[in-house]
């Protein structure tokens, strides 16, 4: 007989492995693995629905408000999606809003019978593998999966940013930021040599993406985890962490400056790190992002846009390329601009009420992963505020997976089928 634990863990691990390397599977094997991912989500939905029937529709008391808001969100999203005239935009809108919401109960069901420690260990291992490939891409100057991106000319040399199997260095950077948060949590709670090695390798992988937002989000999340686990928030602890990171940063900067004299790749990556603090006209990428934010705000204030929005999936890279949209460079602005203030507020009420319900349940039951889940949520909220990263399937799935770890029903009797 096969245990449900084995089935659920296998299906969830498949989802994680696929989403962390989807560009490899989709490029080499077509849409087969993506369709199977959709099937897994369907299996999870059926399983969750079956459990509701068995329990006669009873839900956790702490999550009742979230469930009501969830159903309301789905209804509002469907109304807006149906009203989109362009069929391609309508399909993308359904995918980004309705399907992404449908994943949540499916993830919750798959997590019910899983060993969380095993899931996290696999997640970290994936990060180590991706980091090794990322180092290869950066210093070899070639991508493992060929794409249209040719890199950046810096000091007369072509420099590339690692994306490995994620199709984008932005998505890769965000995935590596989440993996680095998990690695930091594991090292802080168990300072073994293996956990230290995993942390170092995964942070290096994050650096190879040259994505500044995920790096900043990781550092802030690490501080939150450190302070949360350490007990009461006090300035001395925060100062200690900042001081340690500053010293490490200075040592890396000195090493980088020394090595960059004859290496354009290292010089480029060092320049990217320095530009985190440069929001003047000297930094084209930062000022360009600010311009996108200001334009989004102006569009939001136009006529009735702030009430009804300009329509789901009206912004983003695919919208810009296919139906005259533009990029907001912010998931926060994206939702308010596309959905309007009312629907966007309802969505964020659902999101934060779900996180709050998860934290309450986790504290009550002594869930050991509260700090980790909180760190991941903060990491993605920061990144999604400065980049519309949650329109990526992999990022949204992983974010909700960590939130659902707080909400999941603890394993009792292991059913067999």
Where are these regions (language model features)?
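N-terminal signal-anchor transmembrane segment
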Residues: 1-53, 75-82, 380
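Transmembrane alpha-helices of multi-pass inner-membrane enzymes
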Residues: 11-16, 181, 372-384, 388-417
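Hydrophobic transmembrane alpha-helices and their immediate junctions
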Residues: 61, 192-194, 227-232, 338-381
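Aromatic-anchored transmembrane helix interface
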Residues: 65-74, 86-111, 122, 127
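Alpha-helical transmembrane segments of multi-pass inner-membrane proteins
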Residues: 120-145, 167-228
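Long extracytoplasmic/lumenal interhelical loops at the membrane interface
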Residues: 144-151, 278-339
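A conserved mid-to-late transmembrane alpha helix and its immediate loop/hinge
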Residues: 159, 203, 312, 322-358
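Flexible juxtamembrane loops connecting transmembrane helices in multi-pass membrane enzymes
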Residues: 241, 254-291, 317-320
């Amino acid at each position: 007989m096969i245990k449900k634990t084995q089935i659920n863990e296998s299906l969830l691990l498949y989802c994680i492995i696929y989403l962390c390397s989807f560009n490899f599977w989709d490029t080499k094997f077509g849409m087969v693995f993506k369709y199977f991912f959709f099937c897994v989500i369907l299996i999870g939905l059926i399983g969750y629905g079956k459990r509701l029937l068995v329990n006669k529709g009873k839900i956790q008391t702490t999550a009742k408000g979230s469930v009501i808001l969830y159903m309301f969100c789905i209804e509002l999203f469907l109304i807006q999606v149906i009203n989109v005239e362009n069929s391609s935009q309508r399909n993308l809108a359904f995918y980004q809003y309705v399907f992404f919401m449908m994943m949540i109960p499916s993830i919750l069901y798959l997590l019910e019978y899983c060993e969380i420690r095993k899931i996290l260990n696999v997640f970290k291992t994936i990060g180590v593998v991706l980091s090794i490939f990322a180092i290869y891409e950066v210093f070899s100057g070639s991508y493992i999966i060929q794409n249209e991106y040719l890199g950046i000319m810096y000091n007369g040399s072509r420099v590339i940013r690692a994306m490995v199997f994620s199709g984008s260095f932005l998505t890769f950077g965000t995935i590596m930021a989440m993996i680095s948060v998990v690695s930091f949590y594991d090292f802080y709670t168990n300072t073994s040599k293996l956990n230290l090695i995993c942390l170092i390798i995964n942070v290096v992988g994050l650096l190879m993406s040259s994505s500044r937002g995920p790096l900043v989000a990781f550092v802030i999340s690490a501080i939150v985890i450190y302070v949360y686990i350490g007990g009461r928030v006090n300035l001395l602890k925060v100062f200690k962490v900042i001081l340690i990171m500053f010293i490490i940063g200075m040592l890396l900067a000195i090493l980088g400056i020394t090595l960059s004299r004859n290496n354009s790749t290292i010089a480029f990556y060092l320049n990217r790190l320095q530009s985190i603090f440069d929001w003047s006209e000297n930094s084209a990428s930062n000022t360009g992002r600010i311009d996108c934010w200001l334009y989004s705000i102006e569009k939001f204030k136009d006529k009735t846009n702030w009430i009804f929005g300009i329509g789901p999936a009206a912004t983003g890279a695919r919208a810009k390329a296919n139906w005259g949209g533009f990029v907001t460079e912010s998931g926060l602005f994206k939702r308010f601009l596309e959905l309007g203030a009312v629907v966007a507020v309802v969505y964020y009420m659902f999101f934060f009420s779900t996180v709050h319900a998860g934290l309450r349940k986790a504290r009550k039951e002594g869930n050991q992963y509260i700090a980790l889940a909180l760190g991941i949520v903060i990491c993605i909220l920061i990144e999604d505020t400065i980049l519309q990263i949650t329109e990526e399937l992999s990022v949204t799935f992983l974010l909700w997976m960590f939130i659902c770890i707080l909400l999941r029903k603890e394993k009792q009797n292991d059913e067999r089928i």
